[in-house]
């Protein structure tokens, strides 16, 4: 039993494209042995070379020794928690901040149900999901940058 779609070689449009060398490859390329024996080792070795090269060219800096009696003025979380930190910092009600954080995965779960009529996988043909992704990314970057600024200018970046 085959799961790949066989081409209709009687189709005149496909014949014309195949004559020009522009036909679509309906059969695909098998993962064994092409990917597993040839492409994956190249990617793994390339990643390993990048990690080794970057560690040699830019080693980790050894900072000043830790002093448990000198607390910094503001302790910032890791960079990937900046948007959440900014959200909790600027929302006056902490319960509202937690509910806003819970609204993000809840909103992402509802996207397939909102756009269930659309059968396309192309992002240009799925405007709701694409718009939600772009707006969410921009808001996360905006909140992340604002988390590193003082709270007075964190939402406007000091522009207004």
From Swiss-Prot:
It is a multi-pass membrane protein. GO terms for cellular component: chloroplast thylakoid membrane; mitochondrion. Pfam families: Cytochrom_B_C (PF00032). Keywords: Chloroplast, Electron transport, Membrane, Photosynthesis, Plastid, Thylakoid, Transmembrane, Transmembrane helix, Transport. One of its GO terms (biological process) is photosynthetic electron transport chain. The chain crosses the membrane at residues 36-56, 95-115, 131-151. It is found in: Plastid, Chloroplast thylakoid membrane. GO terms for molecular function: electron transporter, transferring electrons within cytochrome b6/f complex of photosystem II activity; electron transporter, transferring electrons within the cyclic electron transport pathway of photosynthesis activity; ubiquinol-cytochrome-c reductase activity. Its main location: plastid. The 4 large subunits of the cytochrome b6-f complex are cytochrome b6, subunit IV (17 kDa polypeptide, petD), cytochrome f and the Rieske protein, while the 4 small subunits are petG, petL, petM and petN. The complex functions as a dimer. Component of the cytochrome b6-f complex, which mediates electron transfer between photosystem II (PSII) and photosystem I (PSI), cyclic electron flow around PSI, and state transitions. HAMAP family: Cytb6_f_subIV (MF_01344). NCBIfam families: cytb6_f_IV (TIGR01156). PANTHER family: CYTOCHROME B, CYTOCHROME B_B6 C-TERMINAL REGION PROFILE DOMAIN-CONTAINING PROTEIN. Belongs to the cytochrome b family. PetD subfamily. This is Cytochrome b6-f complex subunit 4. It comes from Tetradesmus obliquus (Green alga). The gene is petD.
